[in-house]
């Protein structure tokens, strides 16, 4: 299933061609693209130039790389934690170096060294070790024109919260 806007556009156009309703497919894409561009524009006001580290044990992070880039964020590191679910050879975006076997220790070292604005990961981080804003990458992201965008909206909101919430003082 398509997670990103661009994947969904290709999917809709292919289906429209199969069913010989290209005009309806194009109309749907145009309608959704207008809304998508508006939403991306709002998000970019908050994300352009922000630095992010991406660390995943999930099967495919290409959709995360795509939406993060589209929102103008700088990807400092992207890596796969060891996992039986990996599909490293199926990555659609290959212009950055994705680190295979990215260890948790290396992730914490990179957080300390590069001080990113945000870490996106599939694992819970030790807040005392990480001391960084981080968001979870869903194993089953939303699909469709606005699938990846919904995750990006959530991650954007994390950028403006405190690094450590008050309740954590009691842990």
Briefly describe each language-model feature range.
Residues 1-171:
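An N-terminal assembly and electron-transfer interface module characteristic of large anaerobic redox
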